[in-house]
């Protein structure tokens, strides 16, 4: 019985050591965002615009289908977060599994999800991976597109459909 108690207590203490090292998702993504800012991994709006027109760049969005349908950067690809590596294969590889687009800009609302996915994309072999906040795109009065349609979403939030700009951008 003493041995069982010693084992339980030691297991609890040993487990406590690991629990103290646990970092929350928010703290982890914040830490990665700070590192990305310091290392120059945060893309500028001009870099996103240039990437949309470049042959060797892909702008990929890791937000949910609903977020992407509500507002996305025209020309970006939604890869989601569940299996982004599979979705990327259709965008960045040719028929011989060679990179045709070896540079990525990863987009989400505030870059929290993008910075985490960027780590995986770097390990997959992408030469350059940058991160971008779609909120910045919108705040700087760039247009977004929506995948909602007035015909299908009559009870929606009265959002304008098609290309639209943030309200503060109206002249």
Where are these regions (language model features)?
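Positively charged n-region of N-terminal signal peptides that target proteins for export
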Residues: 1-6
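Bacterial N-terminal signal peptides
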Residues: 7-16
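Rhodanese-like catalytic fold shared by cysteine-dependent sulfurtransferases
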Residues: 20-46, 51-54, 69-103, 112-171
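Structural scaffold elements adjacent to functional motifs in cytosolic proteins
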Residues: 59-61
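Short glycine-rich anion-binding loops that position phosphate/pyrophosphate groups of nucleotides
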Residues: 65
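Short, surface-exposed ligand- or partner-binding patches at beta-edge/loop junctions that are enriched
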Residues: 106-107
């Amino acid at each position: 019985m003493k041995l069982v108690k010693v084992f339980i207590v030691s297991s609890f203490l040993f487990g406590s050591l690991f629990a103290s090292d646990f970092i929350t998702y928010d703290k982890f993504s914040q830490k990665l965002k700070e590192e990305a800012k310091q290392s120059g991994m945060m893309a500028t709006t001009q870099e996103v615009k240039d990437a949309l027109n470049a042959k060797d760049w892909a702008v990929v969005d890791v937000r949910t289908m609903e977020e992407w349908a509500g507002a996305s950067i025209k020309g970006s690809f939604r890869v989601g977060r569940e299996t982004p590596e599979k979705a990327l294969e259709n965008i960045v590889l040719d028929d011989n599994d060679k990179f045709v687009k070896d540079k990525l800009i990863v987009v989400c609302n505030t870059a929290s999800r993008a910075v985490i996915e960027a780590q995986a994309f770097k390990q997959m072999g992408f030469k350059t991976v940058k991160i971008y906040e779609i909120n910045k795109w919108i705040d700087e009065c760039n247009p977004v597109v929506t995948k909602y349609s007035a015909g299908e979403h009559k009870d929606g939030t009265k959002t304008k459909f098609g290309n639209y700009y943030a309200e503060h951008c109206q002249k």
